[in-house]
Structures are given as structure tokens and as C-alpha cells.
Amino acid sequence: MKRISILGVTGSIGTQTLDVLRFHKEDFELVGITANRNIELTMDIIKEFSPKYVAINHEESYKKLVDLVKSQGLKCEVIYGMEGLVKVATLDEIDIVVTSVVGMIGLKPTVEAIRKGKDIALANKETLVVAGELVMREAKENGVKILPVDSEHSAIFQSLQGNAHNKIDKILLTASGGPFRGFTIEDLKSVTPERALKHPKWNMGQKISIDSSTLMNKGLEVIEAHWLFDCPYKDIEVVVHPQSIIHSMVQYTDGAVIAQLGVPDMKLPIQYALNYPNRQGNISEKLDLFKIRELTFEKPDLDTFKCLKLAYEAGEKGKLMPTILNGANEVCVELFLNKKITYLQIPEIIEECMNTFDYNKEVTLHNVINLDKEVRQYIYEKYN
């Protein structure tokens, strides 16, 4: 039996991970969980899965959960804040950590888990974006497997199995194109948060839905792929594939292209990461090739969707530039959702930050966290 901690258990990836655990009850034990504000769902999870440790990152929610757990006689330790996240990620009794929290908050617990020798099922792409050099070095030194949960990176990971890494010609990273595929800049001027949250293929949280609409999500995935697969940016090509059936591909030097296909369901890559190197029974609808009318492919429009272009630039510059990109994007998405800035201001402000801050420093946990704070403070003071 594999023992698991889930960081961000009440979010989209976290709840779908629970679906996988329900489907394979005999194979997994949920030992630790973390959450933020959704105490009602957290209580339901505690009652169903009986985790020993629960970390809450929101102070009022933490106090509320402590009272509920005590009043109902539930046997779990409730811990507060970043200290709690790190504890849940580094428990002696766990084998693997599912990092499904959104944003920079996932960095420290992920790094500490790696240092404790825990395998990582990685859904928190920001960790590799801002500190890929550090994370991959620590993983290598500690003999830890980084198993991608993103559908695209899982597809690449699977397409690489049994093939020589030095024979890769390019990685073909697929993108649905988001809800505004084919839009012009003029069309994007009137985009509201409500429209941007409606993704055509995937059911996701708010932040990743906005990122998918701007193509920043794909940009972050380009940087993530660079670190996961040690692939130069010039050899990572984004391919818009609206049907979202091919989750990504690898083209080899002999011209062969190996792809992973499946229905758009995050439970598939979650299950693969948790069971690697084995494959488990089918948890999702199987792909019916006869129902697929067509598979189409387009080049992304980098002039209209500038976030993808900025991500490539940040990745190429390296050092702490991806930290600036990521921190600026997180704040811009928050301000856009709160209707403080317009949709087209998102890439404008990100580019402004990339031109403002010094990125040419060593990638350490300290430097990443400090620069991230500076970038956020700058945007809040100027635009909030």
C-alpha cells in the first residue's frame, strides 16, 4: 500500500486525486492533507479518509477546523500555516506527495519534501517555473522521482518511455487554444472574468482557467517541460490542438512522432503518476476513435496572446526571470478577477515587471521568495 499526502486537497486536482483513491481503495492510504478556506469539504474528507494530519493555511479557517474536529471527536492533528504544509509534505510515513496547491505557496513544501526523499506527483507547475534548476538538482541529489500530473507533461513522460533521450528532435506541447482561440486583440478588449473562466475542454480552478485563456498556462508548461525533460526551449514547440485528444507528442531524430491520446480527464495522469511505473484499471471513459471526426493543429498566435511569447522570453533569459513572470502573472490574474485591471493589461504589466526587476541572481529558495514578494508588492501598490 502506498501512503500519500495531498497538498491542496479541496482544489480541482486534489478532489480528482481523491476520486482515484476511492477507485483504488486497497492500494492507497491518505495520511496527510492541506487546505485553505474550504472547511466544509475538508471536514467531509477527514470523515471519509481519516488522515492523521491536516494543515490549514488560512487563520480563521484553521481555528474553525480545530473546534469542529474537537467537538466531533475526530482523531487528526490540525496544524496551521506554512509550517503545517511543510510537515504534511515531509511526514516520515508517506511515500509520495501530490502537490496540487496553486501558485508560489507550493514551492517550499515541495522542496522540503524532496530533501526528505519523498517522490513528487507534481501538479503545481509554478514550483518548476520559478525554481526548476533548484528543484531538479535536489531531486537528483536525493534520488527522488518528479512525476508530472499535468496532462501534457504526463503525455510527454509516457512518450519518452523506452526511448533514448538524446534522440529527441523536439517536444510538441499541445494546447486547446482556450476559449478565445481565433480572437483578435480588438476582440479581447471586452473580455470579462466570467467569459475567461469558461474553458472549452477542461474543468479547472479559476487561476488556471484564466491562464489557459491568455495562453500563460501553456507558457508556464513550456518552462516546466524544459526542466522536467532537460530540453532546450528552441526544441519545445506549442501546437494548438482544439480537440484536446492528443495530450502532447515527442518527435525523434528519425522523424517518428510518438503521442499519448486519451479523453480530456485529469484522473488519467493523476492515476499514472500515483501508480508509476505500473498501470492500473480504467478509471475514466475510454477513448473511442470512431467518435473522433477530426484532429486539427494550428500554430499559436503569439502577437495576440503575448503571455506565451513572454514565457518563452523569460525561460530563455533564465535565472530569476521566470520568478518575475510567474509572480506578476499571479497578481495580474487576481486583479483581473477582481475587475481592477483589464484583460489586455495582464501581459502589459507582466512585461513591465520583466523590464523593471533584476533577474540575474542565483536561483536559491531565499532569492526566489524575496523577489516574488517584491514583484507582487510593486503591482499591488501601482494597480490595486
UniProtKB/Swiss-Prot annotation:
Functional pathway: Isoprenoid biosynthesis; isopentenyl diphosphate biosynthesis via DXP pathway; isopentenyl diphosphate from 1-deoxy-D-xylulose 5-phosphate: step 1/6
Domain of life (superkingdom): Bacteria
Residues given in the record as Mn(2+) binding sites: 150, 152, 221
Catalysed reactions, as listed in the record: 2-C-methyl-D-erythritol 4-phosphate + NADP(+) = 1-deoxy-D-xylulose 5-phosphate + NADPH + H(+)
Keyword set, alphabetical order: Isoprene biosynthesis, Manganese, Metal-binding, NADP, Oxidoreductase
Cofactor(s) the protein needs: Mg(2+); Mn(2+)
Molecular functions per Gene Ontology: 1-deoxy-D-xylulose-5-phosphate reductoisomerase activity; manganese ion binding; NADPH binding
Coiled-coil segments: none
Annotated SUPFAM superfamilies: 1-deoxy-D-xylulose-5-phosphate reductoisomerase, C-terminal domain, Glyceraldehyde-3-phosphate dehydrogenase-like, C-terminal domain, NAD(P)-binding Rossmann-fold domains
EC number per UniProt: 1.1.1.267
Entry keyword Transmembrane helix: no
One Pfam family recorded for the sequence: DXP_redisom_C
InterPro entries for the chain: DXP_reductoisomerase (IPR003821), DXP_reductoisomerase_C (IPR013644), DXP_reductoisomerase_N (IPR013512), DXPR_C (IPR026877), DXPR_C_sf (IPR036169), NAD(P)-bd_dom_sf (IPR036291)
EC category: oxidoreductase
Cysteine disulfide partners in this protein: none
Record: residues binding 1-deoxy-D-xylulose 5-phosphate: 125, 151-152, 176, 199, 212, 217-218, 221
Residues where NADPH binds: 10-13, 37-38, 124, 126, 205
Gene Ontology biological process terms, A to Z: isopentenyl diphosphate biosynthetic process, methylerythritol 4-phosphate pathway involved in terpenoid biosynthetic process
Matches recorded under NCBIfam families: Dxr, PRK12464.1
Family label: Belongs to the DXR family.
HAMAP family associated with the record: DXP_reductoisom (MF_00183)
Function: Catalyzes the NADPH-dependent rearrangement and reduction of 1-deoxy-D-xylulose-5-phosphate (DXP) to 2-C-methyl-D-erythritol 4-phosphate (MEP).
Full protein name: 1-deoxy-D-xylulose 5-phosphate reductoisomerase
Lineage: Bacteria, Bacillati, Bacillota, Clostridia, Eubacteriales
